[in-house]
A protein has these predicted regions:
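Short, hydrophobic/aromatic beta-strand segments
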Residues: 64-72, 84, 117-120
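Secreted, periplasmic, or luminal enzymes acting at the cell surface/secretory milieu
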Residues: 1-67, 73, 128, 132-136, ...
């Protein structure tokens, strides 16, 4: 299998278009509304853990209510190294606002959002210099609104290189052009609010285990790849504990360490349950249906009843996948859809 080479480097998605001056048809963060909003910067404050931006959002329309997303992007100091022009560092969505109604938002930008990864040093570092804060409801509409100044370099996190991919030829950066653009926006900071920022390195929690509790590597392998010595594949419809799931690791560590098998999700589409399955009580096993049996509720292979088997049914609620929730730009929705929904399902089934 050929190793996928990501030649774009850090210039992924909107960072590529924004850094190389390519105007897309729809800018990152773009969205339609039945009304219009005004976003106004009210204040900017710093602490060791990050920067807090306070904005006021007003529905300036006359007819419809609506919600607005405030997006904050940051431009980093350009020193000739590989960097993007702007990056998303924070966002928040308002409640539903009636025409003329206002809401104040406090958007926290974590310190590490301003850090750059230095390949040679293998560390995340916030570099000294001026940072531009851009505020708007999309990348193309974001306006330079404030400046954040860091007096000295701060290492946020030290990492360790696990694999060398230096042979990957990445696209040529646009450092020279970005340095020119940086001169333009840094000159504009003189007329805008500026604050000093003295970030502190993160306290990284290190999990340590005694020799008595460490599990040998050969015992951990089944957690990732399943029991390859068994005939049953770890791909397809190989779930045992939860029939229909795309994959399951291993029960090999349960008796000795109390570690159960890991149920695999079928990409972003969930765990792909079978609505019905049969159990052989003599062998205490589930009758497998293969990949085709797990698709379209078994329509492709038809229903087959095994003599003496017990049939079970499991019906589940379909929730929006993570990518759909992310597109709402609503942090509250990301959490409540799952927690409240699962809670209601639990009460109903009980």
């Amino acid at each position: 299998m050929r190793l996928e080479e990501y030649a774009e480097g850090i210039y992924v998605g909107y960072r590529y278009f924004d850094s190389f001056g390519i105007e897309p048809l729809f800018s990152f963060g773009y969205g339609l509304s039945y009304t219009e909003f005004d976003i106004r910067l009210c204040g900017i404050n710093t602490a060791s853990k990050g920067v807090t931006v306070t904005v006021e959002v007003e529905n300036t329309g006359t007819t419809y209510s609506g919600k607005e997303v405030v997006q904050i992007y940051a431009s980093l100091p350009q020193d000739g190294s590989r960097k993007e022009f702007r990056r998303l560092v924070g966002y928040e969505k308002t409640e539903e606002l009636k025409p003329g109604e206002k809401e104040m938002l406090n958007i926290v930008l974590p310190a590490k959002a301003f850090a750059s990864f230095l390949e040679e040093q293998q560390e995340w570092r916030i570099q000294a210099g001026a940072y531009g804060i851009w505020i708007g409801n999309s990348l193309s509409e974001a306006k330079l609104s404030a400046g954040v100044k860091v007096s000295a370099d701060v290492m946020m996190e030290k990492t360790k290189k696990l694999e060398d991919h230096s042979e990957v030829v990445e696209i040529k950066d646009c450092a020279e052009e970005l340095c020119r653009r940086a001169e333009e926006w840094t000159a504009l900071l003189e007329e805008l609010p500026n604050v000093s920022f003295e970030p502190e390195a993160e306290e990284k929690k290190v999990c340590r285990f005694s020799e008595e509790t460490e599990i040998p590597v050969e015992d951990l392998i089944p957690l990732l790849y399943g029991n390859m010595s068994e005939i049953r594949s770890t791909l397809g419809a190989s779930g045992i504990k939860v029939p229909g799931t795309a994959g399951e690791t291993s029960e090999a560590l349960f008796d000795q360490y109390g570690i159960p098998s890991l149920i695999m999700a079928d990409g972003p589409a969930g765990i792909r349950l079978q609505q019905t399955y049969e159990v052989d009580r003599e062998k205490d096993t589930v009758y497998g249906t293969g990949v085709l049996g797990s698709l379209e509720n078994g329509y492709l292979v038809g229903r087959k009843d095994h003599e003496g088997a017990e049939r079970y049914y499991q019906y589940c609620t379909a929730f929006p996948v993570g990518t759909a929730l992310a597109q709402s730009w609503n942090k509250k929705t990301d959490g409540t859809v799952w927690t409240e929904g699962c809670g209601r399902d639990g009460r109903i089934s009980y």
